[in-house]
Amino acid sequence: MLLLPVPAQTICHLFCTVIDNYGDLGVCWRLARHLADEHALAVTLWVDDLVSFQRLAPDIDSAQSSQMLGKLCIRHWQGDAVDATPGDLVIEGFACSLPASYIRAMAARSSAPVWINLEYLSAEAWVEGCHGLSSVHPGTGLIKHFWF
């Protein structure tokens, strides 16, 4: 199992693009709540479709660009416009593409964040060999870790 070091006061930004059937959003929402509740991380869940999110979490106000839901900060993710200091831990839900401006801000940090690409669950044989692999971003040198 790959264990990545994270700071004691960890700020986590989790990005989710809603594709279909709420599966991606459901997994990201559960993961965000788990990280906040069980590991005391300060989690911001960036979601591109708050109307769909409201169907899973009726307390979401789809008209608000930023809101708290329990311990989570929920932010409406609209294209490349991400106005936030990158977290210590950055998770791409299911290979969604992080905004270029956010990646540049990640690279500008004094210490690089832990960057995880959360991938789909699979029982295929190749997955075990890919879990935990890393990839260097060609423009920034940041390292992304793949988590299956």
What function would you assign to each model-found segment?
Residues 95-98, 121-123:
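Short beta->alpha connector loops
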Residues 98, 102, 144-147:
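Internal, well-ordered alpha-helical segments in soluble enzyme and binding-protein domains
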Residues 108-148:
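Active-site-proximal region of nucleotide-activated glycan assembly enzymes
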Residues 35, 106-109:
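Hydrophobic helix-cap positions at the C-terminus of alpha-helices
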Residues 2-89, 93-96:
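Glycosyltransferase specificity loop/lid
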Residues 55-66, 102-106, 129-136:
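Short, aromatic/basic amphipathic alpha-helical patches
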Residues 23, 99-101, 126:
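Short helix/loop capping segments that flank catalytic or ligand/cofactor-binding pockets
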